[in-house]
Design a protein with these regions (language model features):
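Rossmann-fold cofactor-recognition segment
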Residues: 48-63
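C-terminal helical subdomain
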Residues: 173-174, 189-223
Length: 244
């Protein structure tokens, strides 16, 4: 990567995205910050310094995507694109509003597709595209069925693109465990191995600077979930039922 990287972070207004922006800015990167909240983005960009730019974006809106892509393209080739935008609404399936469920699919999965489709036009040759899955995508979790399904889809999307774009782009997958954000604060169950957004940001940046396809953390949780996902269903599903 270049000495001074240009990095586009989507989902930068809070949580992991905001922590990533702060950590990358501290490490000397030049940032393009996107999310739906223009006010939060402008405040973050002002806090980080004049070399960073806020570009509001709704990944579920094609006009917004086109406008943001045009703005990013004017900044010149980007070194990394990191897609973190996500929605989450925990609860039993009978309680989940169908329109909310559809929006979760649109933001988490279709939004990742839209960003992946734009990335080759905006990244420099060999640049990095990172999509955010989750340990919830390793195996379906109770009361997170739509979220788990979308994150499983993002994992498959990243795997497909890693093979499809080999030699053109460096496609990566980020799979966090439980991170203390507005999304996880909605859960009403014990979340093991919880980490702070700052810890998550450091793990992501350090992982993306290696050659590994998947960046997953904290390992004591992610390896356990990976093991659970390869067990036969008769063994795995009773165990997942105990997770919430």
């Amino acid at each position: 990567m270049a000495d001074t990287e240009t990095i586009w972070i989507i989902g930068a207004s809070d949580g992991i995205g905001e922590a990533l922006a702060q950590e990358w800015a501290w490490r000397g990167a030049r940032l393009i910050l996107s999310a739906r909240s223009a006010e939060k983005l402008e405040a973050l960009a002002a806090q980080l310094g004049p070399e960073h730019r806020a570009v509001p974006l709704d990944v579920s809106d094609r006009d917004s995507l086109a406008a943001a892509a045009e703005t990013v393209a004017k900044a010149g080739p980007v070194d990394r694109v990191v897609q973190l935008a996500a929605m989450y609404d925990p609860g039993k399936i009978a309680e989940l509003d169908p329109e909310t469920a559809a929006q979760i699919v649109t933001v988490n999965l279709t939004g990742s597709f839209h960003i992946a489709r734009l990335a080759p036009k905006l990244l420099r040759a060999g640049g990095q595209l990172a999509l955010c899955g989750s340990v919830a995508g390793y195996i379906g979790l109770p009361q997170g069925q739509i979220y788990s399904a979308t994150k499983a889809g993002v994992i498959s999307l990243a795997e497909s693109l890693r093979a499809e774009l080999a030699g053109e782009l460096d496609v990566r997958l980020i799979c966090p465990g439980f991170v203390d954000t507005r999304l996880t604060q909605r859960n009403d169950f014990t979340m093991p191995a919880m980490v702070s957004p700052q810890t998550a940001a450091e793990a992501i940046i350090d992982g993306l600077n290696t050659r590994r396809f998947e960046v997953h953390f904290p390992r004591r949780l992610t390896w356990a979930m990976k093991l659970l996902s390869v067990l036969p269903y008769w063994a795995a599903l009773p165990l997942t039922g105990r997770l919430t």
